[in-house]
Regions:
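Midchain, well-structured core segments that form catalytic/ion-binding scaffolds
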Residues: 135, 147-148, 152-314
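Zn-dependent metallopeptidase/amidohydrolase metal-coordination segment
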Residues: 21-24, 29, 87-91, 376, ...
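A short beta-alpha structural unit
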Residues: 39-43, 285-294, 306-313, 338-358
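N-terminal capping segment at the start of a domain
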Residues: 2-44, 171, 343
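His/Asp/Glu-rich mid-to-C-terminal helical/loop segments that flank catalytic regions of hydrolases
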Residues: 231-233, 249, 253-278, 326, ...
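Active-site-adjacent substrate-binding region
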Residues: 15-18, 29-30, 181-231, 269-274, ...
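Alpha-helical metal-binding/catalytic segments enriched in His/Glu/Asp
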Residues: 89, 98-148, 237-243, 249-275, ...
């Protein structure tokens, strides 16, 4: 199918598809471990239920379904050549605790609609319904990843890491807050931990990975634009920091004798804000903060806090960490405190593949600039309608999948930019535009592929 032919589709099909997506987001939101809120974590009974429902919707859209060895739900629309590689489209169905209903979920449901819109059924004279197949040289596969958020075991991207073949067997011993190990949870879910490597895909099996996701910030809303191409996913480092001072009597210890660990840590948290807020695309967050022994009448002798540091570029991020470290030396030296840290996470930035950025851009242009897909007239006009490109400070499944194939992403406007919160939102109209842009992007990639 060509982009032009897709453009000839009645625009109401995209709205109908978006209505189905929104209704299904509502339906999935009711599958939760916490009534009145949305919480759906890895390998839970809720995970099993949403996989079954997603599989049903995939089959109804003509896809061949299976759940892989890591609990990811997959749906395949094969190419005419069964050996042909596939373009993977998807996102995740797990949530954080007390989540919104769109983060991840909307991307999976949009992928199902896109495959439904693009598929071809060959004429069959026998009167039997011919199986649906991909109209491109490559198959289309919808992936609903089982764990992106890491809400249960503290380790994110478990589902997509298994697909990428970067699974670490040490993860089996990770425990959830109830002391259940990942291994025990997998067995209870019906998975065989010894077979997790079967979920891994070879690079040669894939053409690439495309994901639609709500923006988890306010940038598109502020610009008054519905869609953006994602250029890269943030690099991130996470640290647990400990400040050591001396616990002493709150009444009997004069200020000049105090070595108050909490005050040193507080100054450090403020320094993180001061340093990061003056840097372009560097975000530092202190999200956990504790004082010990934690009594009202004792000067805190120890403080512990976390630091989440993200950046568009690894080098810039590392330079800022060096600057923060020097500042901490200074603060703690002045206050006669000691500090040390343990790095608990380090992921490089993931740059979206130029070709996939191009096709997502073409998809957006075809969607927002009527006629541009058909006659290419915009090509000679300096592209005044160049789609917005954003870097994603939030993590996504593409960070893991990037280990085996090219990654591209499409962002949709999120009013107020609220995410990981029940107020998370996206409009029906923007989802309709997003479905069309994603379908156009796939069609553009199909045309590119044929050419090469
Ligand atoms: Zn997400």
């Amino acid at each position: 199918m060509t982009a032009a032919r897709l453009g000839a589709l009645d625009p109401t099909v995209f709205e109908l598809a978006a209505r189905r997506v929104m209704a299904r987001c509502d339906e999935l939101a009711r599958i939760t471990s916490t009534p009145g809120a949305i919480t759906r974590v890895h390998l839970s009974p809720e995970h099993a239920r949403v996989n079954r429902l997603a599989a049903e919707w995939m089959r109804e859209a003509g896809l061949q379904t299976r759940q892989d060895a890591a609990g990811n739900q997959l749906g395949l629309l094969p190419a005419a050549d069964p050996e042909a590689p596939v373009l993977m489209l998807g996102s995740h169905l797990d949530t954080v605790v007390d989540a919104g209903r769109y983060d991840g979920i909307v991307g999976v449901l949009m992928a199902i609609e896109v495959v439904r819109l693009l598929q071809r059924r060959d004429d069959d004279t026998s009167g039997v319904d011919a199986p649906a197949r991909s109209p491109f040289d490559f198959g289309l596969e919808v992936a609903a990843f089982s764990d992106e958020e890491g809400a249960r075991f503290g380790k994110a991207l478990l589902g997509s890491s298994a697909v990428a073949g970067t699974w670490d067997d040490a993860w089996w011993e990770l425990e959830d807050p109830d002391g259940t190990t990942l291994r025990e949870a997998a067995l209870e879910f019906g998975l065989d931990p010894g077979r997790v490597s079967e979920a891994a895909r070879r690079p040669s099996e894939l053409v690439g990975y495309l994901e639609a996701h709500i923006e988890q910030g306010p940038e598109l809303h502020a610009r008054g634009e519905p869609l953006a191409v994602v250029s890269s996913i943030a690099s991130a480092r996470r640290f647990q920091l400990v400040v050591e001072g001396e616990a002493r009597h709150a009444g009997g210890t004069p200020y000049d004798m105090r070595r108050d660990a909490l005050l040193g840590a507080s100054e450090a948290a403020l320094a993180v804000e001061r340093i990061c807020s003056t840097q372009h695309h560097i975000i530092g967050t202190v999200g956990q903060f504790e004082a010990f022994p934690g009594a009202m009448n004792i000067v805190p002798g120890e403080a512990r806090f976390s630091l989440d540091l993200r950046g568009e570029f690894d080098g810039e991020r590392d330079r800022v960490w060096d600057q923060i470290s020097r500042e901490l030396d200074d603060i703690m030296g002045r206050r006669r405190l000691r500090w040390h840290t343990r790095e608990v996470h380090n992921a490089p930035a993931l740059f979206c593949a130029p070709l996939l950025q191009d096709v997502v851009g073409e998809g957006i242009r075809s969607t927002l600039v009527p006629g541009s897909a058909v006659d290419g007239s915009i090509l000679g006009s300096g592209r005044p309608e160049d789609p917005t490109t954003l870097f994603s400070p939030a993590g996504h499944d593409g960070m893991a999948i990037g280990a085996i194939t090219d990654v591209g992403m499409l962002f949709m406007r999120n009013p107020d930019g609220v995410s990981h919160h029940p107020d998370e939102a996206v409009s029906l109209g923007d989802v309709a535009l997003g479905i069309r842009a994603l379908a156009e992007a796939v069609a553009h990639l199909g045309a590119e592929h044929r050419r090469t």
